[in-house]
Structures are given as structure tokens and as C-alpha cells.
Amino acid sequence: MKPVLTFFFDALKPDSLQHMPFLNSFPHQRRMRAELGHSVTCHPSMYSGVHPDKHLQWFVWKYDPVASPFAWARIFKYLGPLDNLGSRYFLHKYTRRLRPRNTAWFGVPLMLNQPLKYWPYFNVVEDRAWDEPGYLKKYPTAFDVLRQHDVSFEIVGMAKGAGDEFVQIGEHEFGEIHPWTYFFLGSVDHYSHRHGQDSPETIARLRELDRLVEAKFKAYDRRVSDFDFFVWSDHGHIRLERRVNIHAHFRRHGRNIHDFINLVEANYARFWFRDDDERVAVERILGDLDGGFVLTDEHFHRYHLQMPDNRYGDLVFYLDKPAMFSKTIWGFGRKQESMHGYLPDHPGSDGVFISNAPLIEGTHVELVDVLPTLLDSLGLPVPDYVDGRVLWRNHG
């Protein structure tokens, strides 16, 4: 079994490779087409080889009143004026103490700008980390598949709270060489959100990370004479030019957005309706909100987002680049300079795929191609249900 060395960069876009001479020296490069969503969408696609319409993960939060971690707190809907940031922090902290620990990357996040009366309607999609057994309920991940075949692997850089790449990866030394070694580099996304990926701060970081990858590659190369090597990212980044206050937009129409069950996140606003009148009202209000549109069945089909129920919304409003909502469940977005989660059709949404071996023809590959490509390198069978392709030109 030929060993495989891989590096994952969160949010690295193709244009940024000009600042990374080592990675850019590999001639076999493709643009990575993103999923329409954020990390909670992208990671299951790349680890399972199937699109969201199969793995069923699109947003961090879903409509699930029965299993909501806040189901016990329905009485708090009567707080009225006492429903403020302080009471929300308290309820969130208290609930996390009551429940078993959620080890997912996002855990159970605070819904900062969401009234407490709506918290019991929602549950988090993920309950464990990407590499833990059974992360996805319907499909095995790459980590699950390798465990099933008794193939060992090593993950470096994914441990939350253990420091950044220069701590976890920089201090790593190769001992036993496993069939798969996976380095996870997450700071490009953070720097891009904070400064923009074309900023001096992020460019300096990219150069440092390029040197780090080069050092690890050369250390591995000294130990292993023949191995497959590939690098990928899940999406790109797009500079923000404006912020949209959807709360103010509803007020201009004489309504409060919280008259309706909703979640506002980055560039998406999702709604659940209790009757037809609510749907009519929301559709009317959103009808003149510039810069976005309501996702239709055509979008759901095109981007593999067809779901079996309304867990992600009865209506999903998408705000296109280069804008984001200014007041969301995550905060106020004042420090955000760049964003992702836009249509995969936009070139700025693209990630990267780089390898040391020739790739199949075409300009783009997809996140669902990562799993079958990895399994093929390891000599393991690719399951029939997988949506992706093996990317090696000489495959088979």
C-alpha cells in the first residue's frame, strides 16, 4: 500500500497560490468547486464522497423542536424585556453544562441575536467531530472507511484548543509512517474573514504556511521514497462591500422579523411558517430586498440540496456577493472583511486541488472527489454510492 500525504487548507483560493511558491511549484492543479454552504456542508461532502442531498448537512442549526438542547427552556419565551444578551449567555452556558459534551467543531454555539422564545425550535446538526466514528448517520467518512479496513491514519492540526498550525503541525515529528497522514490547516479562513485573503496580513500568513508545508513535505520525503501527495481546500473567499440589515428591512414594511420563526446567518435568512399568511407576508417583504433571492427547487436540484423535509427552512433567502447580513445569530459581523458561502458558480468561491501526479482533464474538481481519490491511492474499493470521481489520470 503506497502511503498518502495530504494537506487541507480551510478557505485557500486559487489566486493566493501566487504567494505560496512551494505549493504553486506543483504542475498538477485544478480549481475546487465548493458546495453552496459553509464548513458544516463542505466537510461531510469531502469526507463522505456524497453531496448534501445524501449526507443531509447544510447549516449548523436545523428545525428540530423534539430534540432541541433548549427544549427544556420553553418557559423562557415569557421573559419579555428580560430576554437580552445577558440572559441568552446564561441560558446557553447553563444548557451546555446540563447536556453531554458536543465534540463537533462548532459544538452548540450561542445564538446571539435570536430571541429565547425560538431557541427550543432548533437543534445542532453535528454532535461529534468529523473524524469520530459515526460522524454521519447514513454514510461512513474516510476515517470510518479506513477503520473498517484496519488501515491506520494520523491526523495533525485538527485538535481544537491545541494551538494553531505552527504549534500542532510545526512541532510534529514523523514516527511510524501511517498509510494516510492528514495535516489540517485552518487559519487561512480566520485571517481571510478578519483581513481579507488579499491583505498584507493574510499574504504574510500564506507565505509562512507555505514554508511550513514545504518543511513537512521534505521531512516526509526523506522517510518515504514513493507516495501520493495532494492538497485541497473547501472554498475560496470574497471581499465584502456592503452589509444588509434585514431587521431594518422588515421594520420598513411594518413588521418585526421575529414575528416569524427565522434564523439569519451570514448571507442566508431562513424562515419556518405556522400558516399560509406568514409565508405570504415574508415573501412580500423579501420581494424588494435587493442583492438576493429566494432559493427555488431549481437551485436545490442544481446544488444537490434537496432535503426530505423542512429542517433547513420552508423558505431560504440567499444574499449574493459581495454582501452579508449585519445582524445574525452569530453576531454583528463588524470585523468581517471577507465571506464565503456564495454560489459555487462565482470564481471567488473556488478552492484548490494540487497533487504530485497527473490529474484527469478539466478545469474543476469537486469536494466529493476527495474520498474516492484517497481510497484509490490506498488501494481500497470506492463504494458505488459515492458521487465523486477518482482524480488520478492513470487510475485503473
Please describe what each predicted stretch is:
Residues 3-5, 178-182, 228, 314:
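Residue-level preference for the first positions of well-ordered beta-strands
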Residues 4-9, 14, 19, 208-248, ...:
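Metal-dependent active-site segment of extracytoplasmic phospho-/sulfohydrolases and closely related
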Residues 14-61:
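Short, structured active-site-proximal loop/turn typified by the sulfatase FGly-forming signature C/S-X-P-X-R
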Residues 32-33, 53-59, 154, 261, ...:
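Acidic/polar loop patches that form or flank catalytic/metal-binding clefts of enzymes
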Residues 50-196, 205-208, 273, 280-281, ...:
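His/Asp/Glu-rich, glycine-adjacent segments
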Residues 226, 235-274, 396:
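Acidic/histidine-rich catalytic neighborhood
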Residues 260-377:
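Active-site neighborhoods of enzymes that stabilize oxyanions during catalysis
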